[in-house]
Amino acid sequence: MYKFWGKVQTHNKRGKKLGFPTANIALHQDIPEGIYISKTKVNRQIYGSVTFIGIAKTFGETRFHAETYILDFNKNIYGKWISVKLIKKIRANEKFNSVSELVEQMKQDAKMARKFFAY
């Protein structure tokens, strides 16, 4: 699989508004679009996470980027360096008909990751 790192950037804080605060990182390598179960390293600690790679089609964006939702994590890490290791692709990137449909899928993605990490 893939591994990448970068400084957490402020974007539009949409993930937080949807109940899934994400660490946004600019990508500097070619990684296939999709949603992945991942491990994220922050300040020498490793956390289970779900990572989105691609273009946020539901919101009509054109920017290719990475967003990582770190499970059960609520610290402010804007401007901090993190590394993300993709473990398993769980689905393709897709455009949802509504934001609520996307949120329901995100809940399922997080549930799958929790099961994978057994917590």
Regions found by a protein language model. Name each.
Residues Y2-Y119:
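Phosphate/ribose-recognition catalytic cores of enzymes acting on nucleotide-derived substrates
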